[in-house]
Amino acid sequence: MTRVNQLPCDCVSTAEESLTSGTCITPTHVTSLSSPLDRSGDVDPLPVSDESGGSKADESMTDADETKKRKRILSGDCEADENNKSDGEIASLNDGVDAFTAICEDLNCSLCNQLPDRPVTILCGHNFCLKCFDKWIDQGNQICATCRSTIPDKMAANPRVNSSLVSVIRYVKVAKTAGVGTANFFPFTSNQDGPENAFRTKRAKIGEENAARIYVTVPFDHFGPIPAEHDPVRNQGVLVGESWENRVECRQWGVHLPHVSCIAGQEDYGAQSVVISGGYKDDEDHGEWFLYTGRSRGRHFANEDQEFEDLNEALRVSCEMGYPVRVVRSYKDRYSAYAPKEGVRYDGVYRIEKCWRKARFPDSFKVCRYLFVRCDNEPAPWNSDESGDRPRPLPNIPELETASDLFERKESPSWDFDEAEGRWRWMKPPPANHEQRERMKMAMTCLLLFVLIILVGSSSILYQY
């Protein structure tokens, strides 16, 4: 067997080209080793130059500034940067562009390669626009357009808009247009710690009603959004997109007060809020507008025709007067792509434009139907734009051709869009709440009694003469 002798090197090695033994402290030449040394985990040494030395010797620079300057020295752009812009401007500009580019590449729709509109995120993590996703599924494709992973049947039949991703897309759009900005991130509000819990004992925990504190100061029959002046806890009001774990916590913030009923209102006064939960297959939900089915009188009347009475009449009164109705979507809505994945979510105020009755099936009982159209100044949770709603034409409803008892508003609505101010507001005075109505009734009663006393006194005086 031939033995390979390691001949001594005839050149003087530098410190970087020698390796010191850990036992005998004998330097070994790296170039003389039989196999190259694995230095993948070592940190590359910085080149020694006058500029880098000056940067290191500058005690006024922080470690972060020193690291950024060394990176520019290695890239060879130091002189050009110093001639044009300052260190902080270059760093912030480069970081912003790199972050925006990286985020856009990760968020883009797998089909149109644009920032997704009403994004749908599948299990593999890739995103689609809701329209692109529906079109992709309608073409018979049930795999991801990027990684070819299988899309589950349940997700293909009922996609859900990723409202968490909407906030990120809003931030990206603001950063792209303005460079600096803040997006509306909506917190998941929970009321589970502290004495404000909705239960105290095991018996009360079943209903979660005992000692449930109401955080806002609006009356129970308040119409429209809940502004900041009625929020003494946070001083911001209830924002569009806020979520809660259940309807009890939603009630504590005054958005929808009934624990069970999906309609909050009074027959002779109007409806203040509705909850989209469960629903029927023919209840269309397109986000900015949806079709809503009325409420039966009870379990024993489920197979009878619905009438415009009780809570159904409250919805019709809101349609007639043009009142804003708060809308809450629940995760229990199985047929909507705009329902949250968990809990309940406040989606803003809508206006009822039309209501009618129709038979759900041939020779079946009639139900009350309502057309809700969004009219809020805040953007919807699924909309990546920063602006609110604008007046839009009413959608075409095919079922109106066979509908009966169609009701449409004839007068101008109380809640309407002000072109001069560019926002939705009360164009007519809002309706008086229950306490104000009771005071008015009491005042009218006292006035009538006073007039009656005067008339009786006058008649008695005339009778004496």
Swiss-Prot record:
Zinc finger (RING-type): 109-148
Residues in the signal sequence: none
Membrane topology type: Single-pass membrane protein
GO cellular component terms given for this protein: cytoplasm; membrane; nucleus
EC number: 2.3.2.27
SMART domains: RING, SRA
Positions of the UniProt region annotated as Disordered: 31-69
A Pfam family reported for this protein in Swiss-Prot or TrEMBL: zf-C3HC4
GO MF annotation list: histone binding; methyl-CpG binding; methyl-CpNpG binding; methyl-CpNpN binding; ubiquitin-protein transferase activity; zinc ion binding
Record's catalysed reaction(s): S-ubiquitinyl-[E2 ubiquitin-conjugating enzyme]-L-cysteine + [acceptor protein]-L-lysine = [E2 ubiquitin-conjugating enzyme]-L-cysteine + N(6)-ubiquitinyl-[acceptor protein]-L-lysine
Function recorded in the entry: E3 ubiquitin-protein ligase. May participate in methylation-dependent transcriptional regulation. Mediates ubiquitination with the E2 ubiquitin-conjugating enzyme UBC11.
Domain-related comment: The RING fingers are required for ubiquitin ligase activity.
UniProt protein name: E3 ubiquitin-protein ligase ORTHRUS-LIKE 1
Gene label: ORTHL
